[in-house]
């Protein structure tokens, strides 16, 4: 995707916020527990390479990604000796590529290990489905069989075992406790404990520090976003959001009563009013459902009117502004703030989706 460096729409990523979130989390971890930075999905929309650099500077001991390509991108960017774990499924035919690049892979099927021809040692993390229902082995028998298969091949190493909690971001903990108990049953069934046992995502690491095991996978909260609104007031420290989204007015005009804007003419002025066109649209991740939401102009709320277009969006202004005036879509302006949580609430989704939708057509600028 082409990045729009010659368009006045941009994202600012505050590296100091990322560092502070990591440091605050590390301060509450036992000394022997590593923090791995989860940088999948372009670092949740924040930019994988720059975020990885920032996280490493702050003390992260490794990285988690979703797909092998993300791991390879980190290696190509200079992270040659860092621990990298692919959390998602990897094709069997790509095992050698991972092995040659010293990338750890998730395994959750016995048949995946059959007839592997490896040219370099491959490090495996066994995924346990303790109740998430996506990927993972579910019984002690499966775990022992896979452990035996790995032990027979001197090119395979069972480096880790892990699970993922479905309800760690909820205050009610009964299902979380069921998952933890199931995982521990499978863990204790192994003859040899792997080097890395890890279960905690952001929510679990914040609310359940006792289950840190050997490492935590610090994702959404590294970016200063709460795993869920339900636990926002129960967090052990204040999270600092790292992402802000800005644009500028490229056209300002006055509408007369009866004038309509955008596709479908869904918005019609009932009085004389000022509107501005913004150079951002659903092709950038500002999806059509943002229509009716608001932005900040000089610290004042300005509603998005009409339908969001592919490349442009129209807002109603509180008064006349000059072309080129700055507009805050996510972030703070003159003491007022629009958060990713605010957008998520309006869109009936979660803050993860809000930032992940912001694609690479919008340039990222890194500050602090």
From Swiss-Prot:
This protein's pathway: Amino-acid biosynthesis; D-alanine biosynthesis; D-alanine from L-alanine: step 1/1
GO function term, MF aspect, one: pyridoxal phosphate binding
Residues binding substrate: 134, 310
Catalytic EC class: isomerase
Single GO BP term: peptidoglycan biosynthetic process
InterPro entries for this protein: Ala_racemase, Ala_racemase/Decarboxylase_C, Ala_racemase_C, Ala_racemase_N, Ala_racemase_pyridoxalP-BS, PLP-binding_barrel
Keywords, ordered alphabetically: Isomerase, Pyridoxal phosphate
Reported cofactor(s): pyridoxal 5'-phosphate
EC number: 5.1.1.1
Family: Belongs to the alanine racemase family.
Pfam families for this protein: Ala_racemase_C, Ala_racemase_N
Protein name: Alanine racemase
Catalyzed chemical reaction(s): L-alanine = D-alanine
Record PROSITE patterns: ALANINE_RACEMASE
Family annotation (Gene3D superfamilies): Alanine racemase, Lyase, Ornithine Decarboxylase, Chain A, domain 1
Functional description taken from the UniProt entry: Catalyzes the interconversion of L-alanine and D-alanine. May also act on other amino acids.
Residues where N6-(pyridoxal phosphate)lysine is found: 40
HAMAP family recorded: Ala_racemase
GO cellular component: cytosol
Origin: domain of life: Bacteria
Active site, UniProt feature: 40, 263
């Amino acid at each position: 995707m082409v990045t729009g460096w010659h368009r006045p729409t941009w994202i600012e990523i505050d590296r100091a916020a990322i560092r502070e979130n990591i440091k605050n989390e590390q301060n509450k971890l036992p000394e022997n527990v590593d923090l791995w930075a989860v940088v999948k999905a372009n670092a949740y929309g924040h930019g994988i390479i720059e975020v990885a650099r920032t996280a490493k500077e702050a003390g992260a001991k490794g990285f988690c990604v979703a797909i092998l390509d993300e791991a390879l991108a980190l290696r190509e960017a200079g992270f040659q000796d860092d621990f990298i774990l692919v959390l998602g499924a990897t094709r069997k035919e790509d095992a050698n590529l991972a092995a040659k690049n010293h990338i750890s892979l998730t395994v959750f099927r016995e048949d995946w290990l059959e007839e592997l021809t490896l040219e370099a040692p491959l490090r495996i993390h066994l995924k346990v489905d303790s109740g998430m229902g996506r990927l993972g082995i579910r019984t002690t028998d499966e775990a022992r069989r896979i452990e035996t298969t790995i032990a027979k091949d001197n090119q395979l190493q069972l480096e880790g075992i892990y699970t993922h909690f479905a309800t760690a971001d909820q205050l009610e903990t009964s299902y979380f406790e069921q998952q933890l108990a199931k995982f521990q049953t499978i863990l204790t069934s192994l003859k040899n404990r792997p080097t890395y046992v890890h279960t905690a995502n952001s929510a679990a690491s914040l609310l359940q520090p006792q289950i840190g095991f050997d490492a935590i996978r610090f994702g959404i909260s590294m970016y200063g976003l709460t795993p869920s609104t339900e636990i926002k007031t129960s967090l052990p420290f204040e999270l600092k959001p790292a992402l802000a989204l800005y644009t500028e007015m490229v056209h300002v005009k006055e509408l007369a009563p009866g004038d309509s804007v955008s596709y479908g003419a869904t918005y019609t002025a009932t009085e004389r009013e000022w509107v501005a066109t913004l150079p951002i649209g659903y092709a950038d991740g500002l999806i059509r459902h943002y229509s009716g939401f608001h932005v900040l102009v000089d610290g004042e709320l300005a509603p998005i009117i009409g339908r969001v277009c592919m490349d442009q969006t129209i807002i109603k202004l509180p008064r006349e502004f000059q072309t080129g005036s700055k507009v805050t879509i996510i972030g703070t302006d003159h003491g007022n703030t629009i958060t990713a949580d605010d957008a998520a609430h309006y869109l009936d989704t979660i803050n993860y989706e809000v930032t992940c939708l912001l694609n690479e057509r919008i340039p990222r600028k890194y500050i602090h």
